[in-house]
Swiss-Prot record:
Name of protein: Heat-inducible transcription repressor HrcA
Record has Transcription as a keyword: yes
GO BP of this protein: negative regulation of DNA-templated transcription
Superkingdom of the source species: Bacteria
Similarity annotation: Belongs to the HrcA family.
Gene3D superfamilies linked to this entry: 3.30.450.40, Heat-inducible transcription repressor hrca homolog, domain 3, Winged helix-like DNA-binding domain superfamily/Winged helix DNA-binding domain
One Pfam family, short name: HrcA
Amino acid sequence: MASADELDRREREILRALVQDYIHTGEPVASQPLLSRHELEWSPATVRSVMADLEALGFLEKPHASSGRIPTERGYRLFVDTMLKVRPPSVADRDRIERLAQAAPDVSSLIEGTADLLHSLSHHAGVVTTPRPQADPVRQLEFVRLRENRVLVVFVSEAGIVTNKLVQLEFAMEPAELERAAAYLNEKLHARADAAELAALRAAILTDMRADQSALHDLLQKALVLAEQSFAGTGVEKVVMEGESSFLDAPEFSDVQKARALLRGFAEKDRILRVLDRVLTAQEVQIFIGAESEFATVPDVSVVAAPYGRGDRVLGTLAVVGPTRMNYARVIPLVDLTARQISRALAALSEGG
């Protein structure tokens, strides 16, 4: 099979025009409509012949014998890599992204708002991973007593990001006890590089409990329970998604079985994380087209993703997931700008926290 750089100018121009038309219409493209919409310098017979050649080379395919042609994943890849002209986000889009970055009161709101905004701007699914615990472990805890047995836990990460969690205890703790428990746990967190892992923290507390027979023993027991409830569910990278159902509006997913398979793919969070974690070492936007993404067991899905972080520390990934027929020229700069603005917002939140 010929490589992409072996295509001549005529083949490239016709492929570019056809991909643009298919992205716009969602309908297989025939030679005559292609000529009427583009200022191509060749005859209809020449265009038909070139389209047949591009099909033989694996860049186009015919979904039906009597229809026009559509791009294959290989055709999309060549288009994105060598023919695509991205355009900067509009002023309105920039304003919406900047407003979210400036207005989010905390990290959770920022992550959820980003997924929703990516969906709203792209009309595809917006996906954001929460900051990875291994990249940004907890280094300080604070406990705020709301009621006798209801405690607000404030986590401060190594990068300075602040998150909160409500914990319901089966016993009461006085403010002074909470203060002592926080001081004790923070000492353990600072003493070991891996102490943010619950297992290591628990082992350190149990060691102290076995060695201590004084009144402090009761506090250590409470601190252990408090730590376990505080860290429960925090050591796992999570995925926030908005707009998965937008796929159902695309003609490519009008088949019920195909749509169901796609939605099952969205439900497999581990699969999504594997895809997005591939972006963590990248310096810029990454585009996975069709089978490249391994996002789902169905074809026609692409992922446009970028890492976000604070300073030189990469914390997570954000992405737009849509049909391979997505408007890459618009989506790629949207993802890029959003990642940069969210990174700035995280820096501001950590400094403010």
